[in-house]
């Protein structure tokens, strides 16, 4: 069978067709200034001196954008490498052609591991948050807080091992030299918890968002067993004019710690013998119309970003990967807001 020769115009025509069909990655590329991340990424990732020769490293922006692709589509490292080779939209997003070298799974893993160990997740998030603030997209007129479970790979431990881990210790058997490989595969930071008769294992993504724009303005990562309200006050600052949250955040302790000019718009909770009055129910309904906007964020992550899960082990990687999820959500929301403003 005669080999098919692909010419320059064939490739251009295919890209043109992708644009006509509404390539979401092209839309994201059109509004993002990826160069704002270059200096920090280079500082953390530059390991070797190539001035004396040798193959130059893959550009840090290409590596970063490969991580963005991996998270948007919730792919494994191997699948990310495969899809970049297979899909023209991925190649165009990265700025590479059919004849260019494609980033491999090991390189993406090493890049993310380096960023995680350098605690770069929060740094990158804050850098983009500064862009959102400078463009006036975050109004601070209303702040919403909530948390969602982030499922992690389940561990098959004995009851005694789980008890030891829950006490903040590592089982002695795992610490033996011959079990070093086993310990590397054990997550001693994730926790089991139960909510509404559903069992969860992993971590929690505690999120603060701007009520007007639905942009995430802060976040924290904890194990799944920590109560939602434990990180609420850490999120608040003097710019916040009103705090919206569900009834899990209600209580005198949070109300007493609110900033002076921050209005308490947390939904009220009924108790045994003290049910909510009709007025309280009506007020809760009004508050919920604003508060529910944060659920749209988690819905986007579950749907458009193909799930809120992680495949890594340990709190360090969890902080990075969950932070990357929040950052990429902001990228996508930013693209939507920019496109909406030009309509």
Spans of features found by a protein language model:
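Charged, often Cys/His-bearing segments associated with DNA-binding zinc-finger transcription factors
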Residues: 1-43, 337-343
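Basic, short loop/linker segments at the boundary and entry of helix-turn-helix/winged-helix-like folds
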Residues: 26-68, 72
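Secondary-structure capping and boundary motifs in well-ordered enzyme cores
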Residues: 33, 54-62, 100-104, 286, ...
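Trp/Phe/Arg-rich N-terminal binding region typifying the photolyase-homology
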Residues: 48-60, 74-113, 117
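Helix-centered, glycine/charged polyanion-binding patches within enzymatic domains
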Residues: 241-242, 247-316, 320
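Charge-patterned, long linear interaction tracts outside catalytic cores
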Residues: 316-343
């Amino acid at each position: 069978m005669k080999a098919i020769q692909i010419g320059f115009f064939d490739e251009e025509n295919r890209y043109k067709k992708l644009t006509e069909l509404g390539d979401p990655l092209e839309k994201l590329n059109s509004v993002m200034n990826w160069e704002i991340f270059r200096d920090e990424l280079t500082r953390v990732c530059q390991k070797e001196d190539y001035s004396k020769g040798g193959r130059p490293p893959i550009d840090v922006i290409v590596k970063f954008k490969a991580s963005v692709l991996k998270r948007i589509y919730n792919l494994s490292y191997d699948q990310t490498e495969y899809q970049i080779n297979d899909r023209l939209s991925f190649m165009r997003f990265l700025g590479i052609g059919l004849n260019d070298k494609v980033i491999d799974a090991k390189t993406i893993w090493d890049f993310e591991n380096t960023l995680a160990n350098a605690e770069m997740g929060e740094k990158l998030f804050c850098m983009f948050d500064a862009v959102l603030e400078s463009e006036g997209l975050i109004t601070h007129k209303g702040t919403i807080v909530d948390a969602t479970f982030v499922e992690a790979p389940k561990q098959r431990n004995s009851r005694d091992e789980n008890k030891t881990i829950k006490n903040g210790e590592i089982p002695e058997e795992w610490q033996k030299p011959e079990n070093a490989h086993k310990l590397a595969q054990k997550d001693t930071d994730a926790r089991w918890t139960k909510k509404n008769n559903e069992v969860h294992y992993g971590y929690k993504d505690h999120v603060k968002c701007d009520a007007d724009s639905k942009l995430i303005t802060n976040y924290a990562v904890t194990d799944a067993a920590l109560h939602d309200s434990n990180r609420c006050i850490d999120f608040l600052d003097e710019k916040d004019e009103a705090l919206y949250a569900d009834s899990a955040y209600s209580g005198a302790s949070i109300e007493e710690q609110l900033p002076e000019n921050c209005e308490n718009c947390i939904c009220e909770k009924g108790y045994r013998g003290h049910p909510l009055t009709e007025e309280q129910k009506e007020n809760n309904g009004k508050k919920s119309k604003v508060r529910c906007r944060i659920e749209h964020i988690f819905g986007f992550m579950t749907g458009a970003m193909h799930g809120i899960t992680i495949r890594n082990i340990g709190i360090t990687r969890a902080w990075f990967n969950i932070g990357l999820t929040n950052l990429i959500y902001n990228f996508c929301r930013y693209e939507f807001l920019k496109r909406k403003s030009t309509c």
